[in-house]
Amino acid sequence: MPQLSKSLSFDGRDIRLELGLFAPQAGGSVLISSGDTAVLVAATRSTAREGIDFLPLTVDYEERMYAAGRIPGGFLRREGRPPERATLTSRLIDRPLRPLFPSWLRDDLQVVATTLSMDETVPPDVLAVTGASIATLVAKIPFYGPMAAVRVGLVGDDFIINPTYREIEKGDLDLVVAGTPAGVIMVEAGANQLPEADVIEAIDFGYEAVQELIKAQQSLLAELGIEQILPEAPNADNTLENFVRDRASSGVQQVLQHFSFTKSERDAALDEVKASVVEAIAALPEEDPVRSVTAAEPKALGNTFKALTKTLMRQQILRDGVRVDGRKLDQVRPISSQVGLLPPRVHGSGLFQRGLTQVLSIATLGTPGDAQELDDLHPDTQKRYLHHYNMPPYSVGETRPMRSPGRREIGHGALAERALLPVLPSKEEFPYVIRVVSEVLSSNGSTSMGSVCGSTLALMDAGVPIKKPVSGAAMGLIREGDEYRVLTDIQGIEDFLGDMDFKVAGTDQGITALQMDMKIHGLPLEIIADAINQAKPARLHILNKMLEAIATPRADLSTYAPRLFRIQINPEQIGLVIGPGGKTIRSITEQTGAKIDIEDTGAVTISAVDADSALRAKSIIEGMTRTITAGDVYIGKVTRIIPIGAFVEFLPGKEGMIHISQIADYRVARVEDELTVGDEVVVKVREIDQKGRVNLTRKGIDPEEVSAARAAVEAS
């Protein structure tokens, strides 16, 4: 491929494209950059493998720490497994890319995006999405592109294209819109309870910007002399399709119109219809074309039967407005919500069920030291709210090996996490680190939105003072030409056989998260707006059902949740509290059993299983860091005796010395004649010397000062 450098002005910034310089053996590659952020994207195609009946597409996003001038942590000092945010970026690239490949394509495809340089103003993810489209087009892979993506932020009342990290943090919206000439193909968003109208306007605003990038790609192809030929499906032999349609259409229609069937009953009934077709094929002569096709391609019959089922289900919805379970298009499945089902050792739990989808969410409260440390290129280095999603095989009635979380689990967990973030209390209001785990116990569609609802229940049961409860619903779509139907609360078969999976989460005030995926080449804004607006009454209905189980967060935390107290000290006193080599802070921890976390700002969080231990540690630290002035009177305890005086702990962790001459108004020959270790004594600060040592006295203390000191002790 010839080398080409191109720069285009996009919304006040330059986007630079470098083609042909890097990765010469890849099918197509581009270095796409903006500011100091540069992403190399390479797309490669290889010959199809035998027996493949799907598109083997792999999309990988890789981060290198050198991109930010850093060396990786860990013993090996080398990048290992991709961090969670890199996995989410891989999904972000994959989701708008995958639907644009022809359904018949079976070649191995791989798209690899590697961030080579990064600054803290330009996020690399949307550059990688657009770069993936360019690399695929340049590689001349059959592709219904171009496709591009932008990020939309909302700061004040103004929408911003491709905001910086700081603008994203300050704003009320973080929206990624991907589109093609045919329409919007992917949406991913987190929002601060924005009204539906604002979100729709933001998607429209983003799609308009996407059009500029699409035109730039078309211009680039013309400059390179690459003619984009829209692929056509190879000629198919319809012999098997016609046979299956003739033998199975009536049976499949009867099953789809048997609205009282459960999922397992419907699946079993469809299997019976399919089995009758298998028997009919087996009765054919060996030389019959239908039998020859099924013998040559073992998966052909199953795929053809699925295609027929899909067609008939879609026709039923478009024609009659009725779904396979008898629901209306905008009807939500039966809902059940419960809290506190698990023993009290669990800090909070919620069980949410919608139809046959059941999710158990468990909330755990931790200390600031439990926050997740993030070692990637993103400016944020810590997470204090974590949501983890698990979906074991038994949730769909299957058996398979248990694996570590994959991309799907990570993606669903992140979506539910994003949905709750806007309603969580601030660190100052609620200093706990919060982890919610959602266990999908049964799955029949929309488990991620079930996790949103379960998370809300678990957080409220745990006593987390969330600002508003959050619910979510998954919307589907059946579209044929200009005719379409939007489906509320899709179940598994509708997700599998439909054109769209659009997840909408939010409160009664507005939207907190969106995720839209397509199986077609794009949608006009009107259909997207219909889906968002149709989701609102569904969300509110679900929310009201959830509030029947628990209306407000519990007033008290679990008995087994740690007790946290926060105090502020002078940052210059951090070293005093920690002590040489951590000696002092370890001593406090050993004495009290409390855990102590100190931030650079001087914010100290003290936590323990019981409040008394935490309060004891708090008292010690406050005593150590309290400003002491001459003339202050304290009630103390003798800790040591030496020939020239006695040491007294007059504040927790704070000692001073009474010289023998200051023990009494008369001459004292031996300290032991007046004091013993453990004695309670009233002392006054006589002076603080240049080395910070506190000199105490028992002389000249008024009775009123003694009373005030005792009152202070009782109050603490």
Swiss-Prot record:
Its cofactor is Mg(2+). It comes from the Bacteria. NCBIfam families: polynuc_phos (TIGR03591), PRK11824.1 (NF008805). This is Polyribonucleotide nucleotidyltransferase. GO terms for biological process: mRNA catabolic process; RNA processing. SMART domains: KH, S1. It is an enzyme of class 2 (transferase). Residues 562-621 form the KH domain.
